[in-house]
Amino acid sequence: MIKKIVTTCFGLVLGLCVFGVGLVAIAILVTYPKLPSLDSLQHYQPKMPLTIYSADGEVIGIYGEQRREFTKIGDFPEVLRNAVIAAEDKRFYQHWGVDVWGVARAVVGNIVAGGVQSGASTITQQVAKNFYLSSEKTFTRKFNEALLAYKIEQSLSKDKILELYFNQIYLGQRAYGFASAAQIYFNKDVRELTLAEVAMLAGLPKAPSAYNPIVNPERAKLRQKYILNNMLEEKMITLQQRDQALNEELHYERFVQKIDQSALYVAEMVRQELYEKYGEDAYTQGFKVYTTVRTDHQKVATEALRKALRNFDRGSSYRGAESYIDLSKGEDVEETVSQYLSGLYTVDKMVPAIVLDVTKRKNVVIQLPSGKRVTLDGRSLGFAARAVNNEKMGESRIRRGSVIRVRNNGGRWVVVQEPLLQATLVSLDAKTGAVRALVGGYDFHSKTFNRAAQAMRQPGSTFKPFIYSAALSKGMTASTMVNDAPISLPGKGANGSVWTPKNSDGRYSGYITLRQALTASKNMVSIRILMSIGVGYAHEYIQRFGFKPSELPASLSMALGTGETTPLKIAEAYSVFANGGYRVSSHVIDKIYGSDGRLRAQMQPLVAGQNAPQAIDPRNAYIMYKIMQDVVRVGTARGAAALGRSDIAGKTGTTNDNKDAWFVGFNPDVVTAVYIGFDKPKSMGRAGYGGTIAVPVWVDYMRFALKGGQGKGMKVPEGVVSSNGEYYMKERMVTDPGLVVDNSGIAAQPSRRIREDKEAGAEDVERGAADEVRQEVQETPVLPSNTGSKQPQLDSLF
């Protein structure tokens, strides 16, 4: 009877086993063909951030969540490979993807625990999970993981599997892979790690947060000891090495990628351009983008701009605290303050601080980002003293929890504030359009709006040279005389009213030459010129400089620069004057490399005199250059003469009520535009003229950008003649070329010549030309308005 029972039980067990094996076999047959392809492993491309560099190789921007540096398995030190194997998978080189003995141990443990509590995942299984599967603890997921691990083992070598694991695994602190972790935790190359450091990092895969040595040093130390003992047991290290490693004091020096703060606006422009092309992939493909800007130029430009804004704001009253945090709750105040300050940036040496207390004497106790506490007395508070506990200032008063800015002024901390006024500077290579410097505002962190490329502003009188260029093309000369007198135009004002424009200074000079008019920035002359050549003609002609029709008002107000455009577009347009009449396009990207180091794309810019289209007659460009040299020499931009250079030219601009101030200056090599104004347009007051506030910024930057001696000035194009210090297109030269434009704006009879006190260099004069040429003034044919519309190409990528 007993024998029969035993036999029956044995048969049942055997049957169940066979049945179970059959079920497993069926599951394998059904599941295995559905396993994902291993292409992503065989052609592994880790997610690597977009890194942007200046032309001189400084990092100016990094975009992407994952910090990873791909490293081949042979470049990882053997001691690290041994440590990871000892910690995660001792039988890595013996099993076929699944460690059967490890599984058996885990099964027993789970049965005892009454559920799935632990696993026996091999390194291969972890690769399968990290690339293809979720982290949920279910038998189905573990079964698929085991099958996928087997498939991986059949397709890839052990070293390749290890390489994938070492580069893909997350190790905390935004570090993916051991090479990245070595930098982030120890600020070392992975090949420089000691045994103690290796064992500490090898403990992270199991639980990056729990075994983070910075956050949980005690648990991390226990994990390190466990790994070192395993290495000793596997005879990977000696007893002496283990003991030395255990006794070694580790120094955590978190790697912080240094990002040059002077070119953040440029980096953002590049990021946007790549995102438009690649979407989210732009942040994961490991692109390394080299730009055209140099950090030394950026730093000088930034400081020049900030100095002007600081000076303008110096007389302003204190506007109040930057923000406020509630410190009344029962939280750890020191930790709350430190955490809040860690998210703020020091800008222009203005350090963020939080008010901890206001004493009875109204001294203010603050905490700095360093953790240091400072007491500000009345002298340190300065202009901010009236804001201390001043209920009339509401939320902006200085009180406990207020966020303010301070600066170390010779050992004394004083309260300061960021200027409200904003500014931008953009500098281009006149021949290629390459951006050499671009600062989009006072501070990128507080306001990311890029005023150089995004701010649509009225250019004011900086637009006048384009009107004058159109006039030269239409038949006028630099000595053509125009009546600078008041004018009233019925029906040309708002709602059909009378338009009565005025010169900005309220002064009128009667008949003066075009040269004199542009030098003094006479509004009445610009309007009469436009009336003479026709709004339609000018509207089409000026598009050759790169302006869109929508940026050009089809009315006489165009003569005063009432359209809207960006500082970058203005600089690009002025490059036509600087480079001899060629249309080039601004660009900030030079080269793009892939994560493998191969060149993926290189900018092929339009170059003046080579492949760039001719936008205007080179003689026209030259004459405009010579006229605008007088603007610098004796006109509204004479402050730029402080550089002591004879090759510079330019034009100032100021809009109604001094809301916008401009200066665009150049020589044949560099064009630099400066714009200053409030983001919400309002008057800057009496100091808000282009020649007063914008020119000094330009001078400070260009003194550095043009260092290295005097330039030669623009080469005289063929067909330009000089007489009595004035320059003409050869066919326009007459013995008495002074042409008058009367009140109506219609060309009238020739008049006497006004001779100007200007000396021409010997290289500028074509002797005898005035005696040989006498003919009627004629119009230069207008090129199609889309001339120069061809854009520079970024080969293979864009």
Curated annotation (Swiss-Prot):
Transmembrane segments: 10-30
Chain's role: Cell wall formation. Synthesis of cross-linked peptidoglycan from the lipid intermediates. The enzyme has a penicillin-insensitive transglycosylase N-terminal domain (formation of linear glycan strands) and a penicillin-sensitive transpeptidase C-terminal domain (cross-linking of the peptide subunits).
GO cellular component terms given for this protein: outer membrane-bounded periplasmic space; plasma membrane
Organism of origin: Neisseria cinerea
Region Disordered: start-end pairs: 751-798
Entry-linked Pfam families: PCB_OB (PF17092), Transgly (PF00912), Transpeptidase (PF00905)
Record's protein name: Penicillin-binding protein 1A
Catalysis: reaction(s): [GlcNAc-(1->4)-Mur2Ac(oyl-L-Ala-gamma-D-Glu-L-Lys-D-Ala-D-Ala)](n)-di-trans,octa-cis-undecaprenyl diphosphate + beta-D-GlcNAc-(1->4)-Mur2Ac(oyl-L-Ala-gamma-D-Glu-L-Lys-D-Ala-D-Ala)-di-trans,octa-cis-undecaprenyl diphosphate = [GlcNAc-(1->4)-Mur2Ac(oyl-L-Ala-gamma-D-Glu-L-Lys-D-Ala-D-Ala)](n+1)-di-trans,octa-cis-undecaprenyl diphosphate + di-trans,octa-cis-undecaprenyl diphosphate + H(+); Preferential cleavage: (Ac)2-L-Lys-D-Ala-|-D-Ala. Also transpeptidation of peptidyl-alanyl moieties that are N-acyl substituents of D-alanine
Name of the coding gene: mrcA
Cytoplasmic side: 1-9
Domain of life: Bacteria
Region Transpeptidase, residue ranges: 414-700
Region (Transglycosylase): 50-218
Ranges per topology, Periplasmic: 31-798
Family designation: In the N-terminal section; belongs to the glycosyltransferase 51 family.
Statement: the UniProt record of this protein carries the keyword Acetylation: no
EC number(s) given by UniProt: 2.4.99.28, 3.4.16.4
